[in-house]
Amino acid sequence: MSSNGSLTKDEVVNIIKDWNFSWSIIFLLITIVLQYGYPSRSMMVYVFKMFILWLLWPASMALSIFSAIYPISLASQIISGILAAICAVMWLAYFVQSIRLFMRTGSWWSFNPESNCLLNVPIGGTTVVRPLVEDSTSVTAVVNDGHLKMAGMHFGRCDYDRLPMEITVAKPSVLIALKMVKRQSYGTNSGVAIFHRYKAGNYRRPTIIQDEELALLRA
């Protein structure tokens, strides 16, 4: 450092080198999460993505509060205070909606920050729950060699002949029921079925068996 307190050229270059390595790792992780962070691709990466999204609210609020307490100017203090209030209100709204959805479904997927829709499919005496990113009046089920996929997501093993006749989509304010309207087999224990919305109401979905749900998430 020079006598007047400013950094020398070599010190600036060394700092850039250090941060360049760190940011290269950070951006690589962000790229992986954005590229593969979908339930239809990798459930493990998707859960990691949800964890990062969940941490962004308190991190944003903490930074805004810190900027409001230690401002660089009066304008930045006012703006930081407004941003902190907005973060707090939105985070509270997220928890309210998530708790309402949890009371309706009993699934920890209710706290998914990316979606407030849950697809509930009864299979083999339990109900498998997956987050539904896109809301739709119809859902397509594909069974390939005894393995079920719905809305692009894996639901584990399920025989084509044992497909449920009704599935549900849960939201914080409503539970939507979809019934099978068409099915077509195309091989041994394989086929396609279409479920279409036919009723909605303010009622709860039957509780799930948590251990089996977690086991399916790890599958």
Curated annotation (Swiss-Prot):
Keyword Magnesium tagged: no
Subcellular location: Virion membrane; Host Golgi apparatus membrane
Family listed: Belongs to the betacoronaviruses M protein family.
Function: Component of the viral envelope that plays a central role in virus morphogenesis and assembly via its interactions with other viral proteins.
UniProt keyword list: Glycoprotein, Host Golgi apparatus, Host membrane, Host-virus interaction, Membrane, Transmembrane, Transmembrane helix, Viral envelope protein, Viral immunoevasion, Viral matrix protein, Virion
MF terms (GO), sorted A to Z: structural constituent of virion
Binding partners and assembly: Homomultimer. Interacts with envelope E protein in the budding compartment of the host cell, which is located between endoplasmic reticulum and the Golgi complex. Forms a complex with HE and S proteins. Interacts with nucleocapsid N protein. This interaction probably participates in RNA packaging into the virus.
UniProt name for this protein: Membrane protein
Main subcellular localisation: virion
Record topology, Intravirion segments: 40-49, 100-219
Coiled-coil intervals, chain numbering: none
GO CC terms of this entry: host cell Golgi membrane; membrane; viral envelope; virion membrane
InterPro entries: M_CoV, M_MERS-like-CoV
UniProt membrane topology term: Multi-pass membrane protein
Transmembrane intervals: 19-39, 50-70, 79-99
